[in-house]
């Protein structure tokens, strides 16, 4: 299940599911979302094979949430900037990956806690790292 969350988060920019208006989203999913994000704006749903992805604005941030077809929230993600990372993670990036630039960075919050995922690039390589403990990075493996 943990890898499902990570995989969903990692493919957030690659998701090309079918758009689903509110009328095409199961009532239990809508209820769960509305209970958690009652003041959300600009809500857009995408239906995948076995989950829903919803993109929305909440407290002046763009968030992405993933729900099972039964209405269980699998995780919430948002893009962040490097200054929002915990200090240990920032220090680790500066020390170990100084010759890379950040191509993508986001935060995932779910029942297991908070995780960070980053895509780094340089002229020769592209790597994806994850941190679930907020103190060090490890290569992301699907």
Question: What is the predicted function of each stretch?
Answer:
Residues 1-24, 33:
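Bacterial Sec-dependent N-terminal signal peptides
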């Amino acid at each position: 299940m943990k890898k499902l969350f990570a995989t969903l988060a990692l493919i957030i920019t690659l998701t090309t599911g079918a758009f689903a208006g509110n009328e095409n989203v199961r009532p239990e999913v809508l209820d769960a979302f509305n209970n958690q994000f009652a003041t959300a704006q600009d809500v857009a749903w995408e239906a995948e094979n076995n989950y829903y992805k919803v993109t929305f604005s909440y407290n002046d941030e763009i968030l992405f949430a993933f729900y099972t077809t039964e209405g269980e929230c699998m995780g919430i993600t948002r893009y962040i900037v490097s200054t929002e990372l915990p200090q240990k993670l920032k220090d680790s990036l500066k020390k170990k990956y100084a010759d890379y630039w950040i191509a993508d960075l986001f935060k995932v919050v779910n029942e297991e806690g908070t995780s960070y995922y980053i895509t780094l690039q340089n002229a020769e390589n592209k790597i994806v790292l994850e941190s679930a403990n907020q103190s060090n990075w490890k290569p992301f493996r699907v």
